[in-house]
C-alpha cells in the first residue's frame, strides 16, 4: 500500500490500480517500498542466466491483519492497561482498506500460477490485495476485532495532545534511537483515507477467505 500512499501531503486515495494520485512518499519506509516496486516492475520480461524469461508483478497489501499479528496484540495490551478501554486516535472518516493475511498469501499463490500463462495480463503490473473485510478507520476496525474480548470504545484523544505526544516521541527516536508506534508519520497516515477498489478479482480469479 505505502508504495502508493498516503502521500506526504495527506491527500486521500479512493480508487484502483490506475487511479491518478500524487505519489510522493514522505518517510523512508514508504520510499523504500516505492523503490522496490519500481525495481520489480522493471525486471519483468528480463532474460535470466539460463536464457529463460523472468516475469514479475507486484502485490500491494492494504493493512494486513490476522493470526500472529504483533501490532494487534500490542493494541490489545494497551487497552487492557487502560481498563479494557480503547481511546481513539483516528478520525472516524479516515477510512482504510484492510486485508486478511490469508488472502495475501493466496494472492501470491495465484500470481505464481497466472503469471506463467501466455498473454497473461498481470505481467509487469501491480495489484492491491483485497478481501471482504470492512473499510473503516483503524480504530473502528481494531474495535471490531477486540470487542469480543471485552474491549470497549473510549473517548477520542484531542488532536493537539496527539501532536504533542508525536513530537516528543520523534525527539526520543532522534536522540535515543527509541522508536514508538505513535509518531508524526503514523499519525498522518492513519488519519488519511486510503480505500482501494481492486481489479484483481478478474485477473487472478480470486475468491477471498475473509
Curated annotation (Swiss-Prot):
The keyword Isomerase applies. Gene3D superfamilies: NAD(P)-binding Rossmann-like Domain. The keyword Isomerase applies. It comes from the Viruses. Its EC number is 1.1.1.145, 5.3.3.1. One of its GO terms (molecular function) is 3-beta-hydroxy-Delta5-steroid dehydrogenase (NAD+) activity. It holds the Pfam family 3Beta_HSD. GO terms for biological process: steroid biosynthetic process. Induction: Expressed in the early phase of the viral replicative cycle. Keywords: Early protein, Host-virus interaction, Isomerase, Multifunctional enzyme, NAD, Oxidoreductase, Steroidogenesis, Viral immunoevasion. InterPro entries: 3Beta_OHSteriod_DH/Estase, NAD(P)-bd_dom_sf. The active site is at 29 (proton acceptor). It catalyses: a 3beta-hydroxy-Delta(5)-steroid + NAD(+) = a 3-oxo-Delta(5)-steroid + NADH + H(+); a 3-oxo-Delta(5)-steroid = a 3-oxo-Delta(4)-steroid. Belongs to the 3-beta-HSD family. Catalyzes the oxidative conversion of Delta(5)-ene-3-beta-hydroxy steroid, and the oxidative conversion of ketosteroids. The 3-beta-HSD enzymatic system plays a crucial role in the biosynthesis of all classes of hormonal steroids. During viral infection, steroid production contributes to virulence by inhibiting the host inflammatory response. This is 3 beta-hydroxysteroid dehydrogenase/Delta 5-->4-isomerase. The lineage of its organism: Viruses, Varidnaviria, Bamfordvirae, Nucleocytoviricota, Pokkesviricetes. The gene is OPG174.
Amino acid at each position: 500500500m505505502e508504495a502508493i500512499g498516503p502521500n506526504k501531503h495527506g491527500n486521500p486515495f479512493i480508487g484502483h490500480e490506475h487511479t491518478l494520485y500524487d505519489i510522493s512518499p514522505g518517510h523512508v519506509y514508504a520510499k523504500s517500498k516505492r523503490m522496490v516496486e519500481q525495481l520489480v516492475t522493471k525486471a519483468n520480461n528480463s532474460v535470466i542466466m539460463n536464457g529463460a524469461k523472468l516475469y514479475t508483478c507486484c502485490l500491494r497489501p492494504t493493512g494486513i491483519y490476522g493470526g500472529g499479528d504483533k501490532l494487534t496484540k500490542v493494541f490489545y495490551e494497551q487497552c487492557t492497561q487502560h481498563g479494557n478501554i480503547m481511546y481513539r486516535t483516528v478520525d472516524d472518516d479516515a477510512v482504510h482498506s484492510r486485508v486478511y493475511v490469508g488472502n495475501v498469501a493466496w494472492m501470491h499463490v495465484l500470481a505464481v500460477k497466472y503469471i506463467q500463462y501466455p498473454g497473461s495480463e498481470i505481467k509487469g503490473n501491480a495489484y492491491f490485495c483485497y478481501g471482504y473485510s470492512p473499510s473503516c478507520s483503524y480504530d473502528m476496525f481494531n474495535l471490531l476485532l477486540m470487542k469480543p474480548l471485552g474491549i470497549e470504545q473510549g473517548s477520542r484523544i484531542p488532536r493537539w495532545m496527539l501532536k504533542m505526544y508525536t513530537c516528543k516521541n520523534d525527539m526520543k527516536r532522534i536522540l535515543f534511537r527509541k522508536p514508538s508506534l505513535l509518531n508524526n508519520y503514523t499519525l498522518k497516515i492513519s488519519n488519511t483515507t486510503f480505500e482501494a477498489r481492486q481489479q484483481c478479482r478478474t485477473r487472478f480469479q480470486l475468491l477471498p477467505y475473509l
